[in-house]
Curated annotation (Swiss-Prot):
Domain of life: Bacteria
Taxonomic path: Bacteria, Pseudomonadati, Pseudomonadota, Gammaproteobacteria, Lysobacterales
PROSITE patterns listed in its UniProt record: MTTASE_N, MTTASE_RADICAL, RADICAL_SAM, TRAM
Residue ranges of every copy of the MTTase N-terminal domain listed in the record: 36-153
Protein name from the UniProt record: tRNA-2-methylthio-N(6)-dimethylallyladenosine synthase
Radical SAM core domain boundaries: 176-415
Length: 484
């Protein structure tokens, strides 16, 4: 695999494609000396989950802090916040109020607030809750060791919510695998500025990690036994990773399609996913990757938000319902049975019954498998927060219930249709409900539970689906020599 030219991947990828560098083999590092305990409470998206894991890595490497699930025994207590939903700030201050007691009796506990609410509120958090020691944004989590030391040395609260572009990734420890599936962040921020969204203001505009840096991280994880890579970004399919800028050469850029093709060549990687996407950036290059790369999961999460062109325009999404459906048709031409999930906002300011019916028509036409659906939540500082909203809350809730019921019914029919089929499942570990069984996910993100030998954990197995449950599937392994 080392030295394999990316230009060999396909004719489509051959134009100005980089050659793969020899990728390092990850070697286990000596465990840090444990000098204290760390507790992290995480709210929000998968990007926050990834960031929290990196906080733990940074503080384990530099401060010797070991994770605990009990804040009362922790030396450092952090909350990684999300500002997408309504009343996010109040929920954070409520959490902080409960933690204030941790400092009783002069215990030198460090309390920190990170994430998107931290970016929005900054110094205001310390003014309202002066017992908070650290406030840091998503782009400055790598500076946690310096912030903690500065707090202890100066006795003053530390606030750093700057946007130092890609510096964060340059200063993180080598990745540590914690199971057969891993998240890899390939970009930060968003430059779309949808009228309802705070992400560009809390995480900054789009910045992509260099192409080769991503490949190195994936190779390190693969060497540690990771078999499934989940590529992360607020607008992940806008990825433009620089390469080939040595010796004064002008940089070239790899898009998500080329990144996926290249990751698929890394030994050990058997499945690739990515989230979250924007329809505007769903390119023909990505469709071609679905056509050509069998490791790319037969699943796509593509948030559409609404089916009314009038509402999509007010949201500043940049596409029409017809344009969205056109992209889905292109994708299904190369992956006819792909599962597609989406996001919907119900009750956006000015949404009429006719607008909502157009959303339901889009749902029917596309046949979404799953959705993350919410009633519109006004976010201060966004353009949509100034729009008049005169739709009664009861009407919004009724629309949401109808939308979710429709998608849930369709998802149930898909699950039922999988009975009798053989699904490729990555074995993640013992089932939560029955430790004598194994569990993993199908390509279309359904949990699958089945009897099996624990030594199969971390491997792909073929499972015959025998029963569809409300939120999962049951099955049995199609036996071969390795599964005996």
């Amino acid at each position: 695999m080392p030295g394999t030219p990316v230009s060999d991947l396909s004719a489509a990828a051959a134009v100005d494609a980089p050659a793969l560098l020899p990728l390092p083999v990850a070697r286990p590092s000596a465990p840090a000396v444990v000098r204290g305990k760390l507790y992290i409470k995480t709210h929000g998206c998968q990007m926050n989950e990834y960031d929290s894991a990196k906080m733990a890595d940074v503080l384990a490497a530099s401060e010797g802090l070991e994770l605990t699930d009990n804040p009362e025994e922790a030396d450092v207590v952090l909350v990684n916040t999300c500002s997408i939903r309504e009343k996010a700030q109040e929920k954070v201050f409520s959490q902080l109020g409960r933690w204030k007691a941790l400092k009783a009796g002069g215990k030198p506990v460090i309390i920190g607030v990170g994430g998107c609410v931290a970016s929005q509120e900054g110094e205001a958090i310390v003014k309202r809750a002066p017992y908070v020691d650290l406030v840091f944004g998503p782009q400055t989590l790598h500076r946690l060791p310096e912030l903690i030391r500065a707090r202890r040395e100066s006795g003053k609260s530390q606030v750093d919510i700057s946007f130092p572009e890609i510096e964060k990734f340059d200063r993180l420890p080598e990745p540590r695998a914690e199971g057969p599936s891993a998240f890899v962040s390939i970009m930060e921020g968003c430059s779309k500025y949808c009228s309802f969204c705070v992400v560009p203001y809390t995480r900054g505009e789009e910045v992509s990690r260099p192409f080769e840096d991503v490949l190195v991280e994936v190779a390190q994880l693969a060497a540690q036994g990771v078999r499934e890579i989940n590529l992360l970004g607020q607008n992940v399919n806008a990825y433009r990773g620089a390469y080939g800028a040595d010796a004064g050469d002008a940089a070239q850029y790899a898009d998500l399609g080329l990144l996926i093709r290249t990751i698929a060549q890394i030994e050990g990687i058997g499945r690739i996913r990515f989230t979250t996407s924007h329809p505007l950036e769903f390119s023909d290059s990505l469709v071609d990757a679905y056509r050509d790369v069998p490791q790319l999961a037969n699943y796509l999460h593509l948030p559409v938000q609404a089916g009314s062109d009038r509402i999509l325009s007010a949201m500043k999404r940049g596409y029409t319902a017809l344009e969205f459906k056109s992209k889905i048709r292109k994708l299904r031409a190369v992956r006819p049975d792909i599962s597609i999930s989406s996001d919907f906002i119900v009750g956006f300011p000015g949404e009429t019954e006719a607008d909502f019916e157009k959303t339901m028509k889009l749902i029917e036409d596309v046949g979404f498998d799953q959705s993350f659906s919410f009633v519109y939540s006004r976010r201060p500082g966004t353009p949509a927060s100034d729009l008049q909203d005169d739709t009664p809350e009861a009407v919004k809730q009724a629309r949401l219930a109808r939308l979710q019921a429709h998608i849930n019914a369709h998802a149930a029919s898909i699950s039922q249709s999988m009975v009798g089929s053989v699904q490729r499942v990555l074995v993640e570990g013992p089932s939560r409900r029955d430790p004598n069984e194994l569990t993993g996910k199908s390509e279309n993100m359904r949990p699958v539970n089945f009897p099996g030998n624990p030594r199969l954990i971390g491997q792909f197995v073929d499972v015959l689906i025998t029963e569809a449950m409300s939120n999962s599937l049951r099955g049995r392994i199609q036996l071969d020599d390795s599964a005996q």
